[in-house]
Amino acid sequence: MEEEDKVYFHEVSFIDKVGQLRTSKIPVVQELARQLKGLNHLPDKFKRVHPDHQLVTPSFALPIPTINMAKLRLVAEPQHKVRAQELAKLASVAKEWGMFLITDHGVPSNVLHGVKDVVKGFFGLPFEEKKASVGSYASVENMGYGRNFVKSEDQPLDWIDRLTMKAAPEGTSEGLHVWPQKPTNFRYFPQNTCMLLSW
């Protein structure tokens, strides 16, 4: 990521169609959104054309599907059928909807709110601080603050900046160099969430 005439960029690398390593500068979406306040259209690089895409009218007639995490954790012999049914439901819902609500996950609401607050705190930092608070994303794993899925100069881009981290088991340091140092309590809530969700 670098600054160029007060326009901020993520620097991404990819292999082009002829097998050459290329580097491209992609605008930082959060900063671009601040600059474009009052604009009523997206920059062309972020537009997608889907000529065969049908217009879908939003409907709230169907409830969002739910997956019961407690049922997925059942391992005792008499409860295999319940677990198998919930796994089948998960596969079906993921395929048909692409999203679902998880219930009975065991994570207290204060921990979930804490995660939300520290992530908002991170994305609320000035660009320079976000950039400085994570490791390099030149890694093969492409973790950290930046962009993902850039495969060519001319592809339409997603309207997103992302922060990707690995929740490594306690005692290892794999992937932990990309965990933000700011806000100072950033690590506490996601780490507790991971511990609560570990089976």
Residue ranges of predicted features:
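Peripheral, non-catalytic segments flanking oxidoreductase cores
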Residues: 1-199
